[in-house]
A protein has these predicted regions:
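Conserved GNAT acetyl-CoA-binding A-motif
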Residues: 94-103, 237-251
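A conserved beta-strand-loop-helix scaffold within acyl/acetyltransferase catalytic domains
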Residues: 38, 44-45, 68-72, 164-217
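Acyl-donor-binding surface of acyltransferase catalytic domains
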Residues: 1, 63, 70-143, 274-278
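C-terminal "cap" of GNAT-fold acetyltransferases
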Residues: 125-146, 243-259, 265-280
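Conserved active-site alpha-helix within GNAT-family acetyltransferase domains
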Residues: 102-121, 227, 251-271
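Short amphipathic alpha-helix that is part of the acyltransferase structural core
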Residues: 1-41, 138-169
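Conserved acetyl-CoA-binding loop-helix of GNAT-fold acetyltransferases
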Residues: 82-94, 213-216, 222-239, 259-264
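Cytosolic beta-strand hydrophobic patch enriched in CBS
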Residues: 54-58, 186-190, 245-246
């Protein structure tokens, strides 16, 4: 314990619980992290890469910071009332690249005191927001397409083809066991031949929802399916008490399609991720 702070390393599921606890307590539209997407990022590959280090810090029994070293790139969250802890987090990390939200100005300044300066990539993620009042009513799907309950096999299949990755049914079952997963927020559309065509998953914490992920099979794109699935998930989130929703998409011009699709649903950019680098 240093300076009244207790660090816990590589705690497995306890780490995720600590991350979600802090993200929920600190959530605002100036926060990078929503508790729901943390659950998704933790479980989407069946758990974190064993080579990636994690830690969280407590002060008087309360989680006040967490850090996730993802192969030499740091993701973190730090209670603004405990910015003095920045030195310990940076020392634990020992690396050179940190990603933050550009609205986290106090954290950016604190990291700057330890040599980190903004140096953005050509690629970055934008954060978009929309209120959940005034959502359009559900429209009919294209001929032959239907809604289907989100069984794990179908959801893993659509995620795999939509994002060009391999996700197993067992991994998706793990996602469905996450405490914050709600099946009514998990929307699945199937094609006329019964194969999965598009999906959207929302997560709700308090009055804020986040969409993560949204995807469409390449052969079924440009039919409005991702938009329909997203709106269905947002309506379900509103029914659970959410008042606003956020989604992240590439904000650079190298991949504008997703951002444009969300803007067509009424989302507007309000912040972006920023990369901070400390010279070697």
């Amino acid at each position: 314990m240093t300076g009244g702070y207790q660090r816990v390393d590589d705690a497995g599921p306890e780490q995720l619980a600590a991350m979600r606890d802090l993200a929920g307590r600190l959530w605002s539209w100036s926060s990078r992290w929503h508790p729901g997407e943390l659950a998704w990022f933790w479980y989407e590959h069946g758990g974190p890469d064993p080579a990636w280090r994690t830690a969280y810090w407590r002060h008087r029994g309360e989680v006040v910071a967490w850090a996730w070293d993802r192969g030499g790139r740091l993701d973190l969250q730090l209670d603004p009332s405990h910015l003095a802890l920045t030195a310990q987090v940076v020392a634990w990390f020992g690396g050179h690249t940190v990603t933050v939200l550009d609205a986290e100005t106090e954290l950016i300044d604190a990291l700057g005191e330890h040599g980190y300066a903004r140096r953005d990539d050509d690629r970055f993620f934008a954060h978009l927001r929309r209120p959940l009042d005034g959502l359009p009513a559900a429209a009919p799907l294209p001929d032959g397409y239907t809604w289907r309950p989100p069984d794990a096999a179908a959801r893993a299949a659509i995620h795999s083809v939509a994002f060009g990755v391999t996700m197993s049914e067992a991994v998706y079952r793990g996602i469905q066991r996450a405490p914050s997963y709600r099946p009514e927020l998990d929307q699945l559309i199937v094609a006329p031949d019964g194969t999965p065509a598009a999906s959207a998953l929302a997560w709700v914490d308090g009055d804020a929802a986040v969409l993560e992920p949204v995807g469409t099979s390449p052969e079924h794109r440009r039919r409005g399916l991702a938009g329909a699935a997203s709106l269905a998930a947002l309506r379900a989130a509103r029914d659970l008490g959410a008042r606003d929703a956020r989604v992240c998409a590439r904000g650079d011009d190298g991949y504008p399609a997703a951002r444009a699709a969300y803007e067509a649903l009424g989302f507007r950019v309000y912040a972006r991720n920023a990369r901070l680098v400390r010279p070697a």
